[in-house]
Amino acid sequence: MTRPGFLVITAVACVLGIAVAAACGHGPNVWTALTTVVLAVLMHAAANVLNDYHDALNGADDANTQGLFPFTGGARLIQNGHVTVQDTHDLAKALILFLIPCGLWLAVQTGGGLIVLGMVGLLLGWGYSAPPLVLMKRGLG
């Protein structure tokens, strides 16, 4: 459900951003940097799980039988009977409920701008395949 192979992209992007900041003279706090990478990866995982959940509800992954795995058709764990739609919903909810207070803590450590970024990330992660936004059907994802 979380599609770990793609989570590496998020981790690399965060580490690159931390490295650029350090090169520009903004040496990172190791704990804050590590927390940033972990939370970014978990947020990406939450978005993937939300996508699998909503695609199962709207039938998008069921209809995608000719897709190029792993790039289309989701993780296929629901479709192959390994997890239920409810399990997927519960994991997405647990990840989000964990991420919100952790993200708020990180924002307090680093500045309020992170709150806006986190809220936009949650909105886009949810809105990618969830109604009423369903951004993927609008060519926005």
Write out the residue ranges for each language-model feature.
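Residue-level recognition of pore/gate-forming positions within transmembrane alpha-helices
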Residues: 14, 40, 67, 96, ...
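Membrane-embedded alpha-helical segments that form the functional core of polytopic membrane enzymes
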Residues: 22-50, 116-126
